[in-house]
Amino acid sequence: MKANYHTHTARCGHATGTDEDYVLAAIEQGFDELGFSDHVPWPYKNGYVHPTVRMHISQMPEYLASVRALAEKYRGQIRILTGFECEYFPDYMGWLADMKAENGLDYLILGNHYDHDDEHGFYFGHTSTAEQIRRYVDSAVKGMETGMFAYLAHPDLFMRDYGRPLDADGRAAAKELCQACKALNMPMEYNLHDRF
């Protein structure tokens, strides 16, 4: 089966085109399934929304309605699933579980971009020290252990701006992530950047 489950929309601020553009491209490329998994709009108490990372929470109903309308429109040509890409933010896991159930989502993926939140937390794509790698791995494994996620997205995110070839710390982190995924029966995505 040819499938992609990591598809963002223009609502997140770093994707372009319409939702339907993605569906038509997937059909043209012979995909059997397309999963939309825009970045989840966390309900931060202060209302913070990162302008180039995720949609505002007020956009969530329209996002879900759009994807579901496309699933109906293209039924028989491609199967379309509805989900979100999410970080492991312990303070929001209860909200995430409730939101998934209330909205009948098909899946969630673990895209472990930030430590704690995206307003004040460290962005794991800027990792440069062994301590930061350790935080990334610990957070990713804890997220996987919740059982809430279908797979681990771009597990090599910590290498994005690492600035040097994979060293002993990076190799140890990669091995630990692979071992955790195997132990938890968690698929890993291969998708980050053309430089790797």
Give the positions of each predicted feature.
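A generic local structural motif
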Residues: 22, 94-97, 138-139
